[in-house]
UniProtKB/Swiss-Prot annotation:
Organism: Loxosceles spinulosa
InterPro entries, A to Z: PLC-like_Pdiesterase_TIM-brl (IPR017946)
Gene Ontology CC: extracellular region
An MF annotation (GO) of this entry: toxin activity
Keywords of this entry: Cytolysis, Dermonecrotic toxin, Disulfide bond, Hemolysis, Lipid degradation, Lipid metabolism, Lyase, Magnesium, Metal-binding, Secreted, Toxin
SUPFAM superfamilies xrefs: PLC-like phosphodiesterases
Name under which the protein is recorded: Dermonecrotic toxin LspiSicTox-betaIE3ii
Enzyme class of the recorded protein, top EC level: lyase
Amino acid sequence: FALAHMVNDFDILKSYLDEGANGVETDITFSDEGEPEYAFHGVPCDCKRWCRRTVGFNEYLQHVRDLSTPGNPKFREHFIAIVLDLKLNGLSQEALAHGGMRLADKLIAYYWAHGRNATRITFIVSVPKTSEKVFLKTFLEEIKAVGYDDMLSKVAFDFTDNGDFSETQKVFEGLGIHEHIWASDGITNCIPLLFRGTSRLEDLIRQRDVPGYKYISKVYAWTYDKETSVVKALELGVDGVMTNYADFVIGIINKPEHSSKYRLATYQDNPFEKFVKSA
């Protein structure tokens, strides 16, 4: 997966899809009461990026529905994944609970459109901290309560706090989430990867590859903009790279030394199937 980072309005979405990105990351902001309102990041953000792009969340979902529905004039065949980076900091537990329910409601109303149409997006619901787990609890409860359990086949889950994954696994177990987990590791592009290192990323990949282990389906790294970082991630065996330069990452994947081992994921690929790196 070549995941374009911080895609918060329609112009930048078109630009990244034109570059060939098969997935995007979009930042979702909430009211103090927990209502999902906008695609928006704000300052500070990654280096060399405009931080204030924005669009209403309802409009965003309707637009990506058009882009990901075969037969629609706007359909983009290669567009198959969206990471919803949920901006939950500062919300009370009550607001978090409301937010999870309302995110489910909005996906049903504006993306799945109160019906099981042929939309192709897998949503990765990305929560910043495990202490905000009630958001996922009410999200799951609401989808099941209104009879949309089957659409969970198009949903993955992630905590982005770069914490000890053994503790994260316990949180997933407590939520009754035993599959469809995308684990991630990363840091802003303003800080060189050299200073962060890849030890945690390597740990996640090793855990993913344990035979029979089900709590990590995919591992992605963020936000990688330098060739050395992208090549390192590919060599380690990541499933996705989040980047501010999607065409650059795709170009690296397509180089002869990498194209024999890697290709961009398509809709025919299972977003929850493990592809274990050969020894």
